[in-house]
Amino acid sequence: MNNRVHQGHLARKRFGQNFLNDRFVIDSIVSAINPQKGQAMVEIGPGLAALTEPVGERLDKLTVIELDRDLAARLQTHPFLGPKLTIYQQDAMTMNFGELSAQLGQPLRVFGNLPYNISTPLMFHLFSYTDAIADMHFMLQKEVVNRLVAGPNSKAYGRLSVMAQYYCQVIPVLEVPPSAFTPPPKVDSAVVRLVPHATMPYPVKDIRVLSRITTEAFNQRRKTIRNSLDNLFSVETLTEMGIDPAMRAENISVAQYCQMANYLSENAPLKES
């Protein structure tokens, strides 16, 4: 039997499809999301409706974004979900979540079992709309969740950690084994909750500057920042900010990265693109 076939649908590798089928895990995720009528619930990648059905049962309306044309068509004809659903058959990377929030008249509650092959770029896309998002609950590769929650001085700490924690409070919810999916992925999975900060703990003047600094630092994470960021900061400037030039990218806190970004914004601002 082909283990890529589930409920008559052949899982497509190019879409990174792994379908959740463990009832206990599904119920645990839905309980964590706790959807309520009247909320602007948005699911990314509903697939074969493992989460869509139990979430939809609690709602009058649900918005879903599904790239796979066949799966979108199945949802349209779903026996009880169909009338409740607003279906966008498109790539979530092209969705303007700000416009969607404006249409629905409130901040979005976004959730989904994200395709692991696009989860990181999709998270960065969503971070740019955090002013339009109330919270997010995602099933991700466990290694990605570890990176999201990691603090300084750990191998998992990287650019994703800094940017996620700049925008959101990051809370791990539960771990999920490969056996909970069809076909089973080759990696462990985990569910994470991301809640955009109501007030930014470390506001930056220009997010592009923070993005540039973290990219350059972590692209050369084994180098000390006196070397990896020598095109941006002198040793004297780092020392004046109270940041040890002998530290590596993984030793620097989110607050310190934001401090560095604001210094650069004030003293060497990026040109408008």
From Swiss-Prot:
Main location: cytoplasm
Positions of S-adenosyl-L-methionine binding: 18, 20, 45, 66, 91, 113
Keyword terms of this UniProt record: Cytoplasm, Methyltransferase, RNA-binding, rRNA processing, S-adenosyl-L-methionine, Transferase
Presence of keyword RNA-binding: yes
Annotated GO CC locations: cytosol
Family stated for the protein in its record: Belongs to the class I-like SAM-binding methyltransferase superfamily. rRNA adenine N(6)-methyltransferase family. RsmA subfamily.
E.C. designation(s): 2.1.1.182
Domain of life according to the entry: Bacteria
Places the protein is found: Cytoplasm
Enzyme class label: transferase
UniProt xrefs under NCBIfam families: ksgA
Catalyzed reactions: adenosine(1518)/adenosine(1519) in 16S rRNA + 4 S-adenosyl-L-methionine = N(6)-dimethyladenosine(1518)/N(6)-dimethyladenosine(1519) in 16S rRNA + 4 S-adenosyl-L-homocysteine + 4 H(+)
GO molecular function: 16S rRNA (adenine(1518)-N(6)/adenine(1519)-N(6))-dimethyltransferase activity; RNA binding
Free-text function comment from the UniProt entry: Specifically dimethylates two adjacent adenosines (A1518 and A1519) in the loop of a conserved hairpin near the 3'-end of 16S rRNA in the 30S particle. May play a critical role in biogenesis of 30S subunits.
InterPro entries on file: KsgA/Erm, rRNA_Ade_diMease-like_C, rRNA_Ade_Mease_Trfase_CS, rRNA_Ade_methylase_Trfase_N, rRNA_adenine_dimethylase, SAM-dependent_MTases_sf
Record-linked Gene3D superfamilies: Ribosomal RNA adenine dimethylase-like, domain 2 (1.10.8.100), Vaccinia Virus protein VP39 (3.40.50.150)
Protein name: Ribosomal RNA small subunit methyltransferase A
